[in-house]
């Protein structure tokens, strides 16, 4: 993003997590995720929205590992059998949540300004802003990961899909083996920023932005070095 890039150059190097640069965001949108869940006025769409909102509410109130599908059905005001027709597991509900986040990112449109790094920064911050209202719930879900290896594998697969989408939206190829490698690298960057994001209480998410900017800069530096070495060897 050109405005962000100019601000970064004017303020020097990105701050560290211990002393982050107070970056200013210039977002055109402030996405509301909850409206993205429903796929229609009724039927499966309304069940999906009710299930996701109930799951997040329960995760925010207590340990996600203790939440059952029965708890989610009761919180959503749905018969358990009705819920299970659409979502046979908690993992399936989290998948619906992530698809809602993907829709929110896509609905905000493309980013065409700045370098590839700037575009990726904008798109990943767009995703984190959409997650912001649910940070407490998501931190509870993340804390339960060691007890749910199947859920972790499914979550990693969904994250790779989301990162491939992010690359494509930024105008970077996500096809073939090179695209998969890029998606895995971007997923690693994104995942490494989440612990900072969980704890970032600043009004403008400045600590999160500084951490993300620094990690993307590291990846950019490594890729530039690898390209230079490849040319030197040919």
Model regions: which residues?
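An extended, acidic
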Residues: 128-131, 139-154, 163-166, 186, ...
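Helix-turn-helix
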Residues: 50, 54, 58-92, 96
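Basic, helix-initiating cap at the start of DNA-binding domains
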Residues: 2-11, 19-62, 70-71
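Amphipathic alpha-helical interaction segments
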Residues: 50, 71, 122, 126, ...
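Amphipathic alpha-helical packing segments from all-alpha helical-bundle domains
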Residues: 150-172, 180-192, 210, 218
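Short, basic, alpha-helical segments at the C-terminal edge of helix-turn-helix-like DNA-binding modules
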Residues: 98-105
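C-terminal peripheral helix-coil segments that are non-catalytic and often amphipathic
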Residues: 2-13, 18-31, 168, 199-234
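Hydrophobic alpha-helical connector segments
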Residues: 96, 109-143, 147, 157-158
């Amino acid at each position: 993003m050109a405005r962000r890039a100019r601000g970064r150059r004017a303020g020097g190097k990105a701050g560290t997590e211990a002393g982050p640069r107070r970056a200013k965001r210039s977002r055109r949108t402030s996405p509301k995720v909850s409206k993205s869940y429903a796929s229609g006025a009724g039927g499966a769409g309304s069940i999906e929205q009710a299930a996701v909102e109930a799951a997040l509410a329960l995760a925010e109130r207590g340990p996600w590992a203790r939440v059952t599908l029965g708890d989610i059905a009761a919180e959503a005001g749905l018969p358990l059998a009705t819920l299970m027709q659409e979502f046979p597991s908690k993992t399936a509900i989290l998948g619906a949540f992530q698809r809602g986040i993907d829709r929110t990112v896509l609905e905000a449109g493309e980013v065409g300004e700045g370098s590839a790094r700037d575009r990726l920064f904008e798109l990943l911050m767009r995703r984190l802003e959409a997650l912001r209202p649910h940070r407490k719930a998501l931190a509870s879900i993340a804390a339960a990961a060691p007890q749910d290896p199947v859920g972790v594998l499914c979550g990693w697969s969904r994250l790779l899909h989301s990162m491939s989408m992010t690359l494509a939206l930024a105008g970077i190829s996500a096809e073939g083996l090179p695209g998969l490698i890029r998606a895995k690298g971007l997923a690693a960057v994104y995942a490494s920023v989440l612990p900072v994001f969980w704890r970032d209480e600043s009004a403008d998410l400045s600590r999160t932005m500084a951490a993300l900017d620094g990690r993307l800069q590291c990846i950019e530096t490594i890729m530039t070095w690898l390209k230079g070495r490849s040319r030197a060897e040919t």
